[in-house]
C-alpha cells in the first residue's frame, strides 16, 4: 500500500474516531467506508509502575477495543544487580491489586515482559552468575503466577563480548531449559524474542545480542525444546514477515511496532514513520496461523487509536489480497 494512502486513510479514520467514537468508523460523512473487523484481539504493552493498571485506565482501554495487555516494567520489582526491591509480600500485594483491576475491567493479561540487562542476561558465561540469573528470574515467574499470564517473554541475551557468541548460545539454551520448567509450572508458555542486530557489532568492544537474524533465530529455536516458542518483534528486524514465516506455528506472541530495522524506534504502525510493509506482515501472520493478540509495543497517542489502526491495516491487507 502506498504510504501516502495509508497516511490519508489514517488521518480520516482518526478524525472519525475522535469526533464520534471508535465504534462509528464505518460511516464516512460523504462516502461509505465498509471496514471489516480484523480476526485478532488487540493488546498493548503497559508498565507495571505507572498508572496504566488503575481501574479507570484499564476500563477505558477495554471500552475502545483493547482486550489484552503485556505487562512490562519488571524493574519495579528487581534492580539491575538482581536484588528484589520489595518483600515478596509487597510484590504479591501489588500483583493482586493489578489482577483485580484487570479482572474488573475485563482485560486479560496475555504476557509478561521479563526484566533484562547486563546482569539479568540468561546467557552469562560465568556459571555462578548465570545460575543466580535463573534463580531470580524463576522466582519472579513464580510470583507472577498471580497475574495468570499465558506467555512469559524473555530476551535471549544482552550485548555480548567479542567472539563469544557460540558459548553464549550454549549458556542461553541451558538457562532457557531450566526456566521453561518454572514457566510450565505456572501453566504459561515461555517465548524468546528476536532482538535488534542490523550488523554484528554494537561498537568495537561489543556484539549485538543473540537472535539478531532470521538464520540465528532458526538455529537457536531448533536447539530449544518445542515447548519454548518464539516472539517476533516487528521493529527489531527489517522485513519482519520473513521471520514470521520462518517461525510459523512456533511463533506464540508478537510485538507490533514500526521501525527501520536499525534502531529501537517502536513507532506506531499508522504513523508512517517506519519502513514495515504491514500488508506483507498481516499476510505472514495469517499464513503462520497466529491467533494471539495483535500486541502493540509501540508509541501511541490514545488507546482508541490501537484498534482503529489495526482495523485499517487489516482492511488494507484485504484490499491488497483480492
Ligand atoms: Zn519487543
Model-identified regions with their sequence ranges:
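Active-site-proximal loop/turn and secondary-structure-junction residues that shape catalytic pockets
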Residues: 48-50, 73-75, 116-118, 156-160, ...
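Active-site clefts of carbohydrate-active enzymes
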Residues: 258-269, 290-305
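Acidic/histidine-rich catalytic cores of soluble enzymes
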Residues: 36-40, 177-275
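Hydrophobic faces of well-ordered beta-strands that scaffold small-molecule active sites
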Residues: 40-46, 69-71, 109-114, 152-154, ...
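Active-site groove signature of glycoside hydrolases
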Residues: 144-165, 186-201, 295-296
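N-terminal pre-domain/capping segments
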Residues: 4, 18-146, 166, 177, ...
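Short, electropositive alpha-helical surface patch
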Residues: 123-141, 163-176, 205-222, 245-253, ...
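Bacterial N-terminal signal peptides
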Residues: 8-16
